[in-house]
Amino acid sequence: MKDALNERQVNLICVGAQKSGTTTLYTILTKHPEFTFARIKEVQYFATDPYTADHRKYHANYRGRVLRRWIADFTPRYLAHPEAASRIAAYNPDTHIIILLRDPVQRAISHYQMKIRNGNETRSFAEVVRSDTEALKHEMTVETGQSVVGRGLYAAQIARYDALFPRNQIHLMRFDDLVKHQEVTVNALLSELGSTSITLTETVHANPAFEPQLKRVWKVVSRLPMVYTARLRMVLRNQSRRSIAQTTPPVDEATLKVLRAFYREDQLALQTRTGWDLSDWI
């Protein structure tokens, strides 16, 4: 079988974090002329266990695509997966890595809400936090793959990539910056990648929290000119927020304090690694 990438390799991977804006960034970059994406957003190749290095199978996800400068894979599971970094490095050590980070407490809440909506969680947020933090305290290594809390231990996860890739290939971004200053933030990334800048005519809100029926409506509406759909877009977003509020249990302040305390050491390490002021996260 002929290799779908014609001797080329995937050279740009957004590894996470989950619930931190990866879908928004993906949506923006799919419109950029220098990027090629797989037929599905999350290929999951390097997070599949048991793992077999079958690169032709991986490349088949790009079959029929026009191959541009950056051949990209956006799979948020890769940041938390304990073996993904080493698998990516073995595949292509020249890969550029994008890591989007969000306040870990807010990320955990969003992750929990997603699991509730999908029917994968029935416990209260307090019960999930209690269970996850106890399990992680007793782990000799940070195994975060299935953990709502563990996925927010960013410094420990980034360290795996730092050990295998040079710093100029690791591109760190903040979720808040992507939300509040979208064009500036995306263009800063594009500058680091040596790619041309973009102009956004509207702010992108790729919202995987939409209920399935709302997703289908949004997909149609998002293709129509903003001038005709601004009010409808607002209605859909408000409906999505109400739906989320109705389907997820409340989060109590005491649990948030427990979570902040649990993340503190990792956040201080992340602050040192990034040079960011993370006082609003700690």
What do the PLM-derived regions correspond to, one by one?
Residues 32, 42-43, 75-76, 151, ...:
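Generic secondary-structure boundary/loop-capping signal
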Residues 1-82, 90-95, 104-138, 165:
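PAPS-dependent sulfotransferase catalytic core
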Residues 58-61, 84, 154-158, 185, ...:
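Alpha-helical packing segments of well-folded alpha/beta enzyme cores
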Residues 7, 15-18, 51, 77-81, ...:
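Aromatic-acidic/polar surface patches that form glycan- and anion
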Residues 52-64, 120-202:
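PAPS-dependent sulfotransferase catalytic domain
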Residues 159-257, 261, 276, 281-282:
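The conserved 3'-phosphoadenosine-5'-phosphosulfate
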Residues 21-22, 58, 72, 88, ...:
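Generic structural signal for small/hydrophobic residues in well-ordered secondary structure
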